[in-house]
Amino acid sequence: MSKNAYAQSGVDVEAGYEVVERIKKHVARTERAGVMGGLGGFGGMFDLSKTGVKEPVLISGTDGVGTKLMLAIKYDKHDTIGQDCVAMCVNDIIAAGAEPLYFLDYVATGKNEPAKLEQVVAGVAEGCVQSGVALIGGETAEMPGMYGEDDYDLAGFAVGVAEKSQIIDGSKVAEGDVLLGLASSGIHSNGYSLVRRVFADYTGEEVLPELEGQKLKDVLLEPTRIYVKAALPLIKEELVNGIAHITGGGFIENVPRMFSDDLAAEIDESKVPVLPIFKALEKYGEIKHEEMFEIFNMGIGLMFAVKPENVERVKELLDEPVYEIGRIVKKDGASVVIK
């Protein structure tokens, strides 16, 4: 068999080497205390003692970005989808009270295109910088026959640490707690199968009246907001009883994940800062209004359950608008009641 047999099978080893060289500078941006070793080892290493946590509990999360990737491919814009991937992982573990420490990514593609994959990893690195996590490992798999030449998939894995006494597991959320929300940056990274159906006949260049001058494609690919730096000070001061990351399933599925079965969340819809894109989706997709809250974040990406006496301190620490959108009540039917 000839020496280029692997290339004849559709796998370009040299392109793989080029990707590694291209991404080194991006990975270097994510360096933080605790990282041991560099790229190229069989496993990434992290020295947990550097965190200063006395009773460490490791908390991990994994996620992808769903079919938002198909829009990145359609619009040939690959430099922010990596940030989405990081956000989906680190926002989940911050909801458990963890400080994210390190991240690993996995990219699978039909054809290794170094310039495009560099953009993807650059986005991952940017997400890591925003989260304060180190990108300590990853895998790029060229899989001809599994994926089309222009296609790729992306997944991420985040590990964080929490003081055992500061774990947020829902057990402290109580009747009377106030629900505070932080704004989302857009759709984030869920519901895109529906989004793509609604806008299937659009080029992405359109400026819809609802979108306040922005092109549709820019709004649809707006990166998922990362909440780590906003939430960590609140966790360290033990100011929040519960945290909900509003992702797939919207308010209805995600808010109840932060409290026990005997409680419910009462949401004042008038206090939710609904973003223009959600109004457009509801209109052009002819989606029932109540269903929107079952699918999308509607403008709130992270929610806290806070004792009334801690509300002002939380607002003081958060250097941004904080939306007081509801409260925790005794359950009498549904787990989330939107009024």
Curated annotation (Swiss-Prot):
GO molecular function: ATP binding; phosphoribosylamine-glycine ligase activity; phosphoribosylformylglycinamidine cyclo-ligase activity
GO biological process: 'de novo' IMP biosynthetic process; adenine biosynthetic process
Cellular compartment(s): Cytoplasm
Disulfide bridges in this chain: none
InterPro entries: PurM-like_C_dom, PurM-like_C_sf, PurM-like_N, PurM-like_N_sf, PurM_cligase
Pathway: Purine metabolism; IMP biosynthesis via de novo pathway; 5-amino-1-(5-phospho-D-ribosyl)imidazole from N(2)-formyl-N(1)-(5-phospho-D-ribosyl)glycinamide: step 2/2
EC supergroup of this enzyme: ligase
Domain of life: Bacteria
Primary subcellular site in the record, as a coarse category: cytoplasm
Catalytic activity entry: 2-formamido-N(1)-(5-O-phospho-beta-D-ribosyl)acetamidine + ATP = 5-amino-1-(5-phospho-beta-D-ribosyl)imidazole + ADP + phosphate + H(+)
Signal peptide: none
Keywords for the protein's UniProt record, in alphabetical order: ATP-binding, Cytoplasm, Ligase, Nucleotide-binding, Purine biosynthesis
Pfam families: AIRS, AIRS_C
Recorded GO CC terms: cytosol
EC number: 6.3.3.1
NCBIfam families (alphabetical): purM
Protein family according to the UniProt entry: Belongs to the AIR synthase family.
Annotated protein name in UniProt: Phosphoribosylformylglycinamidine cyclo-ligase
Native species: Streptococcus thermophilus (strain ATCC BAA-491 / LMD-9)
